């Protein structure tokens, strides 16, 4: 199945990226005219992002197919280049809350489990940049299996940088457990306890699911917390059981939408900073396994409240 998928996606993406670069001058003219008519730089900037993505995709594919890549060096290179593209084309970046720990305060002797909010396409790149470049952690990221259709992510999974969850429940938890157990000092596992990107549809579905299963208290809590999805304990529990000595870094961010919630994938952010807050929870302060679920629920209540308080914060750059 893997070979068949790659036999389709790698040539397809390669031809598509080369085709985009070939018609770049024509697209630039069209984008420039559209920008003049609409008095907006968005068309040209959007084309800039598309062209930069094509170049990054081709370069990364060439590196991966050539072999001999180091997982951590490849990730650092990809994150640095992706962040540079976002900063130069869209003028977006990261603004770290002053209460967050500094890189020097992050423990290096033991592995780290990062529990991050998930809201908006592209936000994950900036979150990963903060962890991998600013905090200098060697990242391992848990993703949905659907993302293996993107050939760079698919091939990077062979390096051990990424873990694609093939199944739900027990099989997925075992994957997370095994990955966490393999972590060494200075390495971090990035998890998204909400299980997916925040959307209004997923939020409503989650509330209805909790109500229909008789978990009325959790349903009321989820209804009040309208900036986040209810966190799922399974992945976090699996990670902590695999790495019992790991500390936890809780990562919250405002997203790029003015209300801190969902943003349509085609609406590129411009001239904005992603406000991020991180909270370090040492391993000694983590609850026992039987208390993990209420701890995570309470933690996510704090996450939701922080987003609600800071969503309208001044993050627009003129």
Q: Language-model features: where?
A:
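A cross-family acyltransferase "interaction/gating" segment
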Residues: 133, 137, 145-160, 184-290
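Conserved glycosyltransferase catalytic-site signature
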Residues: 124, 176, 232-236
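Short acidic-hydrophobic, aromatic-tinged amphipathic segments that line or gate anion-handling sites
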Residues: 97, 162-167, 280-282
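Accessory terminal regions of nucleic-acid processing enzymes
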Residues: 287-318
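A Trp-anchored, charged/polar loop motif used as the substrate-binding/catalytic surface
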Residues: 170-181
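Catalytic core of membrane glycerolipid acyltransferases/transacylases, capturing the structured
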Residues: 56-81, 108-169
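Membrane-anchoring hydrophobic helices of lipid-metabolizing enzymes
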Residues: 1-112, 126
């Amino acid at each position: 199945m893997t070979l068949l998928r790659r036999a389709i996606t790698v040539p397809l993406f390669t031809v598509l990226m080369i085709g985009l670069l070939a018609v770049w001058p024509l697209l630039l003219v069209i984008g420039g005219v559209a920008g003049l008519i609409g008095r907006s730089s968005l068309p040209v900037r959007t084309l800039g992002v598309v062209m930069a993505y094509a170049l990054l995709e081709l370069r990364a594919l060439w590196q991966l197919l050539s072999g001999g890549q180091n997982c951590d060096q490849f990730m650092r290179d990809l994150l640095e280049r992706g962040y540079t593209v976002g900063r130069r084309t869209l003028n977006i970046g990261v603004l770290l809350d002053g209460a967050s720990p500094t890189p020097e305060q992050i423990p290096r002797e033991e592995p780290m489990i990062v529990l991050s909010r998930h809201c908006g396409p592209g936000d994950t790149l900036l979150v990963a940049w903060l962890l991998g470049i600013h905090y200098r952690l060697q990242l391992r990221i848990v993703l949905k299996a659907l993302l293996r259709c993107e050939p760079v992510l698919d091939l990077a999974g062979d390096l051990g940088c990424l873990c694609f969850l093939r199944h739900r429940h027990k099989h997925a938890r075992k994957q997370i457990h095994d990955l966490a157990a393999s972590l060494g000092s200075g390495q971090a596992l990035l998890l998204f306890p909400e299980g997916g990107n925040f959307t209004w549809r997923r939020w409503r579905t989650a509330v209805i699911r909790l109500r229909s299963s008789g978990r009325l208290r959790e349903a009321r809590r989820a209804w009040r917390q309208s900036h986040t999805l209810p966190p799922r304990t399974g992945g976090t529990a699996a990670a902590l059981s695999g790495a019992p000595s790991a500390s936890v870094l809780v990562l919250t961010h405002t997203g790029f939408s003015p209300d801190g919630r969902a943003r349509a994938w085609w609406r590129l952010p411009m001239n904005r900073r992603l406000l991020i807050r991180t909270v370090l929870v040492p391993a000694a302060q983590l609850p026992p396994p039987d208390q993990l679920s209420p701890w995570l629920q309470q933690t996510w209540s704090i996450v939701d409240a922080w987003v609600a308080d800071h969503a309208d914060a001044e993050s627009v750059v003129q």
